[in-house]
C-alpha cells in the first residue's frame, strides 16, 4: 500500500454513564494541542506530514468500548530524502494524546461544549434513521443489563451532563488504567514500529487493569416492545439469541446460516417475504457475533406486521429443518468469501478486521 495506517485505542468495559465520555474524548483531543492549538494549526501540521490524517475512534468491541485515534499516512518508501513520515506522524499523535491544553482543572470548555453538540447531533441522527433506532432499541431490550446493550455514544442526557473537569478526570483514568491496543498496517519493520509506540508511552505512569472476559448472554423470556411514531412506514425488528458467538468453533457455519436466512438479495427472507409475497419494502438479517444475536429488520406497512412475523419465523424454521438449496448455500458462501477477500483491499479494512478479531477474544 502507498498509504499506511495506525490505530491507537484505549479499551474499557462498556458501562452506562461512561460510554458517552469514552466517545467524546477523542474528538475533544483532536480540537487542539499546545503546539497546534486549533483545527487550522492541526491541519497545517498534517499537511506537512504529506497529508496525513487523524480521525477519532469510538467503537464497540463486544463488551468493550475502544476509544482513540485512527491515523492514515504515506508509506516512508515514497517520502523525499529518506524522511520518516511514520516517526514524525507518531510524534505529533503523541502530542495530541498527551499534550492538550487545560483550564480550571479540565479540558478547554469551548472544546468540550463544541464536541458535545456534535455528539448529541449524532445520537439524534439515529432517532431520525428509524431502522438504526429500532435495531438499537431491540439490542437494549434483548441485552438488558449486559454491557452490549449500552449505547456506544451514551444518551443525550448523559452527554449534556458532562463537564470539562469530569471529562479530564475520566481521560486521566483511561490513560492510567485501560489496556492499549495498537495496530499498524504498512511496510515498516515491526520491531521499529514497536519501538516508536513504546516511545509514545514512555512518560506515562500506567497501572493497566485486566478487562473482564467477554460474556455470553443468558436467554430470557420473550418480550414485545412497541413505540408509536408519526411515520409512513413501520420498522419491525425481531431478535433471536443463539449459543454461537465468534468464540465458538461453529462460528463460520453460523455466518453461512445467517447469509442464507437474510444476508443479501439471494436470501430466503428477501426472495420469499419481499419478492414473492411483497409483504415488506425491505428485509434482511444481521449476525451480531460477539453475543450470538441474529437480528431481522424489515420495513413494513402497519397492517402487515403479523403476516411478516409469521413469514420470518417460517423461513427461520426452514433453515432449522435443513430446507436449504444448493444455490442458497453457494450464494451465502460466495458472499462471505468476497467479503473476506476485500479485507486486503485497503489498510483501513485490514485494521478493522484484525482489531475486531483480537478484541473479540
Sequence positions of predicted segments:
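Short helix-to-loop capping/linker segments positioned immediately adjacent to catalytic or ligand/cofactor-binding
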Residues: 104-106, 123, 127, 179-185
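Short, low-order "capping/linker" segments at domain edges
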Residues: 121-125, 221-235, 338-347
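His/Glu-rich zincin catalytic helix
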Residues: 1-50, 81, 155, 164, ...
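Short, surface-exposed recognition loops or helix-turn segments adjacent to catalytic cores
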Residues: 104-116, 133-139, 154-155, 185, ...
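M16 family metallopeptidases and their MPP-like homologs
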Residues: 2-22, 40-95, 99, 131-154, ...
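Short, polar/flexible loop-turn hinges at active-site or ligand-entry regions and domain interfaces
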Residues: 32-35, 77-80, 99-108
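Glycine-rich, mobile lid/loop segments that gate access to catalytic sites or pores
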Residues: 119-127, 138-142
Amino acid at each position: 500500500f502507498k498509504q499506511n495506517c495506525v490505530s491507537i485505542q484505549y479499551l474499557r468495559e462498556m458501562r452506562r454513564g461512561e460510554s458517552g465520555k469514552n466517545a467524546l474524548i477523542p474528538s475533544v483531543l483532536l480540537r487542539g494541542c499546545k503546539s497546534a492549538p486549533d483545527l487550522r494549526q492541526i491541519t497545517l501540521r498534517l499537511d506537512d506530514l504529506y497529508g496525513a490524517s487523524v480521525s477519532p475512534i469510538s467503537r464497540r468491541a463486544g463488551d468493550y468500548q475502544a476509544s482513540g485515534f485512527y491515523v492514515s499516512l504515506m508509506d516512508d518508501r515514497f517520502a523525499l530524502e529518506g524522511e520518516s513520515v511514520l516517526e514524525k506522524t507518531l510524534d505529533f499523535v503523541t502530542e495530541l494524546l498527551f499534550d492538550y491544553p487545560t483550564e480550571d482543572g479540565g479540558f478547554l470548555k469551548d472544546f468540550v461544549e463544541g464536541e458535545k453538540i456534535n455528539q448529541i447531533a449524532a445520537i439524534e441522527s439515529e432517532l431520525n434513521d428509524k431502522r438504526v433506532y429500532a435495531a438499537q432499541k431491540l439490542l437494549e431490550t434483548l441485552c438488558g443489563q449486559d454491557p452490549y446493550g449500552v449505547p456506544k455514544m451514551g444518551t443525550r442526557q448523559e452527554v449534556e451532563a458532562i463537564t470539562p473537569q469530569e471529562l479530564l478526570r475520566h481521560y486521566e483514568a483511561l490513560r492510567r488504567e485501560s489496556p492499549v491496543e495498537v495496530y499498524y498496517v504498512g511496510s515498516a519493520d515491526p520491531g521499529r514500529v514497536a519501538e516508536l509506540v513504546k516511545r509514545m508511552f514512555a512518560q506515562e505512569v500506567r497501572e493497566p487493569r485486566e478487562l473482564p472476559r467477554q460474556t455470553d448472554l443468558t436467554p430470557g423470556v420473550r418480550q414485545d416492545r412497541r413505540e408509536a411514531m408519526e411515520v409512513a412506514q413501520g420498522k419491525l425488528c425481531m431478535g433471536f439469541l443463539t449459543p454461537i458467538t465468534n468464540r465458538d468453533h461453529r462460528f463460520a457455519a453460523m455466518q453461512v446460516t445467517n447469509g442464507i436466512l437474510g444476508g443479501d438479495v439471494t436470501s430466503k427472507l428477501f426472495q420469499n417475504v419481499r419478492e414473492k409475497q411483497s409483504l415488506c419494502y425491505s428485509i434482511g438479517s444481521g449476525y451480531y457475533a460477539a453475543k450470538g444475536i441474529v437480528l431481522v429488520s424489515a420495513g413494513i406497512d402497519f397492517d402487515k406486521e403479523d403476516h411478516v412475523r409469521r413469514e420470518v419465523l417460517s423461513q427461520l424454521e426452514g433453515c432449522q429443518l435443513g430446507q436449504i438449496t444448493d444455490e442458497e448455500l453457494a450464494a451465502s458462501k460466495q458472499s462471505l468469501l468476497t467479503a473476506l477477500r476485500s479485507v486486503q483491499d485497503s489498510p483501513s479494512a485490514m485494521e478493522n478486521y484484525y482489531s475486531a478479531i483480537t478484541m473479540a477474544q
